[in-house]
Amino acid sequence: MNFIDEVKICIKGGNGGNGCVSFHREKFIDRGGPDGGDGGRGGSVIFRSNHHLNTLVNYRYKQHFTAENGENGKGSNRSGKSGKSLALDVPIGTQIFSEDGNILLHDFTEDDQSFEIIKGGSGGLGNSHFKTSVNQAPRKRTEGEIAEEMWIHLSLKLLSDVGLVGLPNAGKSTFLSVVTAAKPKIADYPFTTLVPNLGVVYVDDEEFVIADIPGLIEGAHQGHGLGDKFLKHIERCNVLIHLIDGSSNDVMADYNTVRLELESYSDYLKNKIEIICLNKCDVLTDEEIQEKINELQKATNKEVFPISTYTNLGVNKIVKLALKTIKNQE
């Protein structure tokens, strides 16, 4: 299934039905009074969050959505039937913006939330409302209200507890596959991950959700590579796991490249708790591991953890540390 996280669609409420002009007709009664019924209310447009969805692909090929119109009023004071409301399901994490993207209208952060974005138009009044002492047979009625129509921008930000970051080929997808049941595409070339991947990590009787986004490169926040499009998907997480390729000739430069992109993208990412991991330690000697860890710790003033997703060295420790960090922020 295609991963779609940005769409623009046009939505419209149902118009109200028109009021009816009608007069009571019965045998032996020549001039019955007005009995025109009211028009039915138009249907509303409602968005609902649905945990079974993880993409906005349903809105990629269809852009226009309209609720049902209310029926016109009828004789014998019968009101028209109200139009059915239109319910549009979106993934948890979807944000609804104005067409220009500047005004946030709603943010779905939990399952089964509802948001009525457009109300249906009111039904018109039948002629029975306009009978007066001087006008016993009014032919007046009102038309139903025309419902609002608008273009909106839907943006999906995945909800996860932990975000995986690093340069391409830092081993993020392998890490995800080792600690979860997720099956991301893995190969030894850059940009294997083309879309965000989510997985659930189980630790004893507890669990958390981890997100792997495409690798970052220098200039990602300006649109280079793939990362900038997906950085928003880790804005909501509690902690970042920053993987660094231990086989790199310059681990400090690799670290700084990713940090610059995070800090340039938003303060949300800049200030998140970071767990730094030196990955691929299985291909390094003990002396090389210690040398690179010392270099990183001296520059960052943070603890750096040696791991290997190939041998599982240190992976379980990182998972438990991530869970502890998440719980400390709750």
Curated annotation (Swiss-Prot):
Membrane-spanning segments: none
Q: Name one GO cellular component term.
A: cytoplasm
**Where does the protein principally reside?**
cytoplasm
**Quick one: which gene encodes this?**
obg
Question: Which segments constitute the Obg domain?
Answer: 1-159
Ranges where the OBG-type G domain occurs = 160-327
- Where does it localize? Cytoplasm
Q: Which EC number(s) are documented for this chain?
A: 3.6.5.-
Q: Which cofactor does it need?
A: Mg(2+)
Please give the InterPro entries that the UniProt record associates with this protein.
Answer: G_OBG, GTP-bd, GTP-bd_Obg/CgtA, GTP1-OBG_CS, GTP1_OBG_dom, GTP1_OBG_dom_sf, OBG_GTPase, P-loop_NTPase
Q: What is the lineage of its organism?
A: Bacteria, Pseudomonadati, Pseudomonadota, Alphaproteobacteria, Rickettsiales
Metal-binding: is it a keyword of this entry?
yes
Question: Keyword set for this entry?
Answer: Cytoplasm, GTP-binding, Hydrolase, Magnesium, Metal-binding, Nucleotide-binding
Give the record's GO biological process terms: ribosome biogenesis
The identity of this protein, by name, is GTPase Obg
Species the sequence originates in: Rickettsia felis (strain ATCC VR-1525 / URRWXCal2) (Rickettsia azadi)
Ligand binding (Mg(2+)):
173, 193
**Role, per record:** An essential GTPase which binds GTP, GDP and possibly (p)ppGpp with moderate affinity, with high nucleotide exchange rates and a fairly low GTP hydrolysis rate. Plays a role in control of the cell cycle, stress response, ribosome biogenesis and in those bacteria that undergo differentiation, in morphogenesis control.
Q: Which family does it belong to?
A: Belongs to the TRAFAC class OBG-HflX-like GTPase superfamily. OBG GTPase family.
Q: Where does GTP bind?
A: 166-173, 191-195, 212-215, 279-282, 308-310
**What GO molecular functions are on record for this protein?**
GTP binding; GTPase activity; magnesium ion binding
Q: Which Gene3D superfamilies match?
A: GTP1/OBG domain, P-loop containing nucleotide triphosphate hydrolases
Which CDD domains does this one have?
Obg (cd01898)
* Quaternary structure note: Monomer.
